[in-house]
Regions:
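Single, function-defining residue in the core of a domain
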Residues: 1-14, 22, 108, 146-447
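Gly/serine-rich nucleotide phosphate-binding loop at the start of the catalytic core
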Residues: 1-64
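Short coil/turn segments at secondary-structure boundaries
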Residues: 24-27, 42-47, 75-76, 94, ...
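Short alpha-helix boundary/capping elements
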Residues: 34-39, 53, 104, 340, ...
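Gly/Ser/Thr-rich loops at beta-strand to alpha-helix junctions
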Residues: 36, 101-103, 200-205
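A residue-level signal for conserved active-site and pocket-lining positions in enzyme catalytic cores
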Residues: 45, 137, 371
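Short, surface-exposed loop/strand segments
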Residues: 50-51, 70, 74-75, 200
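Active-site-proximal, Lys/Arg-enriched surface segment
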Residues: 65-157, 287
Length: 447
C-alpha cells in the first residue's frame, strides 16, 4: 500500500507479529478505519479504501475472526515502541490501568454482562448497563506539542462477570487478579525501566501490592481513611514461645490523623488535574497494611488536604516506600488522562460502533481500536519532524494546543496527499488543482 514513509516506519514495527497476507490485510483495514467517519466496521473500512466492489470481501473479516496472530505479542511491540519514542532511557514509565464499558446488547455475545455504568450513575443512584467491560493498560507520556499528558493504550483485556464466568465454565477472576497477572509481563517487557502502576480504588488491594513489590513495580492507588495500618513489629529482648509477631501496634486511622490538631502538615505545590499545579497540605508516613491471615504489606501513605477547602481530604498509598509524596500525588493525577483517551476514542475512532458478535472478533476489534489511538499519536509524532502540529482555530474558539482531532487530521492529510498525488512512472498525470480549493476539499475529507 502506498503510504508516507513516516507512517510506514511506524507500522513496520508490527510486521514480525503477523504473516505476510495477514499483515497486508491488517494494514488495509487500519488505513480504511482512519479515513472513514462514523461506524468502524470492516465493511466501512473497505468503503474507505475504495474496495466496496471487492468480491472476496470475506477475507478481511477473517483477519479478526479467524486468522492466527498473537495479540499479546502485538501489545508488546506497541508498548516497546511507545516507551522508546516518548520515554527517555532509564526514565519512569507510568502505566495507568482502568476499566471502561462498551455498551453492547446482542444476545449472541457470550461474554456480555451487566456492569455498573459510571456514565449514567451518580452518587445517589447506581445504574447497570449491559455490555463488555475492558481492562485497559496505557502508558502516560508527555508530548512536545501540548502541556497535557496523553495516555496511550497498549493492552486491553475483556473482563467477565461471575455469572458469565460460571456459564462459560471458567474460574472467575477479579479486576485486581487479572491486573496481577499482567504485572510480571510488564516487568519482563520493560526490563531496566522503573514502572509506576497507577489505578483507582479498585486496585487498592493488598495482594496486588505484594505482587508489585515482588516484581519491583510501584503500585499507586487511593487508600481508605479507615485502613488497618500497623507499626513494624519490635524484636523481643528474650526468646518467647509461639510465632513471632508480624505487625506491631495499631496506628490511628488516617481520618483521625487528619482531624488531630497535633498532626504536622507540610505545604507545597503539587501537580494537579488539567495540567496545572495546586497548593496542598500533606503529611506522610510508612506503615504495614495488614489483615488477619495475610502477609503485611509495607506501604507509604500520603494524606492530602486542601487548605482552601475546595477538595475533600484524600489518602493515597504506594507499594514503594522510597517514593516522595509529590511523586505519589503526581502519579495518581496522571491517571485521569486515560479518561480523556476513552472519550476521544469514542468520538473519533468509533468505539462502541462495531457490530461483530463472534468471541475472537470481539476480543480483537476493541483492543485494536484502542491501539489505533496510540498509533495515531505515534504517526503524528513521526510526521511532525519540526515539532509543529496543526491546530484548528476559529473566531469563536481560541484553541491554544492541538488535540487528538488535530493529530487525526494530520495523519489523514498525509494519507490523502499520497492518494491524490500518486503518479505513474511511465505516464505521469499532471493535476492542476488550485491551492485554496484543494485545502478546502482536504479539510472537508479529513474533518
Amino acid at each position: 500500500m502506498f503510504l508516507p514513509a513516516e507512517i510506514i516506519a511506524v507500522v513496520e514495527c508490527f510486521r514480525p507479529a503477523f504473516t505476510r497476507p495477514t499483515y497486508e490485510k491488517m494494514l488495509e483495514l487500519m488505513v480504511g478505519t482512519l479515513l472513514i467517519r462514523g461506524r468502524r466496521t470492516v465493511a466501512g473500512a473497505l468503503r474507505g479504501l475504495g474496495k466496496d466492489q471487492e468480491t472476496n470481501w470475506s477475507k478481511y473479516h477473517h483477519v479478526l475472526n479467524r486468522a492466527k496472530w498473537p495479540g499479546l505479542e502485538a501489545s508488546r511491540l506497541l508498548l516497546t515502541l511507545i516507551v522508546t519514542t516518548f520515554v527517555p532511557v532509564g526514565g519512569i514509565v507510568t502505566v495507568a490501568v482502568d476499566e471502561t464499558l462498551e455498551r453492547r446488547w446482542s444476545p449472541r455475545i457470550s461474554k456480555c454482562g451487566y456492569w455498573r455504568d459510571s456514565r449514567s450513575s451518580s452518587k445517589r443512584m447506581s445504574v447497570s448497563s449491559r455490555g463488555l467491560r475492558w481492562l485497559v493498560f496505557a502508558v502516560v507520556v508527555r508530548v512536545p506539542w501540548t502541556a497535557y499528558e496523553l495516555a496511550l493504550p497498549f493492552l486491553s483485556i475483556l473482563l467477565t462477570t461471575p455469572k458469565v464466568s460460571a456459564a462459560l465454565g471458567k474460574p472467575h477472576r477479579t479486576t485486581a487478579e487479572v491486573t496481577g497477572r499482567i504485572v510480571p509481563w510488564l516487568r519482563r517487557t520493560l526490563a531496566g525501566y522503573p514502572i509506576h502502576l497507577v489505578g483507582d480504588h479498585t486496585y487498592a488491594v493488598r495482594e496486588l501490592g505484594r505482587i508489585c513489590q515482588a516484581h519491583q513495580v510501584a503500585l499507586i492507588a487511593p487508600l481508605r481513611l479507615n485502613a488497618r495500618l500497623f507499626e513494624a513489629p519490635c524484636r523481643p529482648r528474650e526468646k518467647r514461645r509461639g510465632r513471632p509477631p508480624v505487625v506491631g501496634a495499631r496506628l490511628p486511622n488516617l481520618n483521625d490523623v487528619a482531624m488531630n490538631p497535633a498532626t504536622r502538615w507540610q505545604r507545597s505545590r503539587v501537580a494537579w488535574y488539567g495540567a496545572t499545579s495546586a497548593i496542598m497540605d500533606w503529611t506522610t508516613g510508612t506503615a504495614l497494611w495488614y489483615a488477619t491471615g495475610e502477609p503485611p504489606l509495607l506501604v507509604r501513605w500520603v494524606l492530602v488536604r486542601d487548605p482552601a477547602g475546595k477538595y475533600p481530604t484524600r489518602a493515597f498509598f504506594t507499594s514503594d516506600p522510597h517514593l516522595t509524596p509529590a511523586q505519589i500525588v503526581a502519579g495518581f493525577v496522571a491517571r485521569w488522562s486515560l479518561e480523556v483517551t476513552y472519550e476521544e476514542s469514542r468520538a473519533h475512532l468509533g468505539i462502541e460502533t462495531q457490530r461483530q458478535w463472534s468471541d475472537k472478533a470481539i476480543e480483537r476489534t476493541t483492543p485494536a481500536l484502542f491501539a489505533l489511538f496510540s498509533l495515531v499519536v505515534l504517526m503524528a509524532h513521526a510526521l511532525s519532524t519540526d515539532g509543529h502540529l496543526p491546530c484548528r482555530r476559529t473566531a469563536w474558539y481560541a484553541k491554544t494546543a492541538p488535540t487528538f482531532h488535530d493529530l487525526l487530521f494530520l495523519v489523514r492529510q498525509a494519507i490523502w496527499q499520497q492518494i491524490l498525488f500518486q503518479t505513474d512512472d511511465f505516464s505521469p498525470d499532471l493535476r492542476n488543482i488550485s491551492s485554496p480549493h484543494f485545502e478546502r476539499l482536504l479539510a472537508a475529507v479529513c474533518y
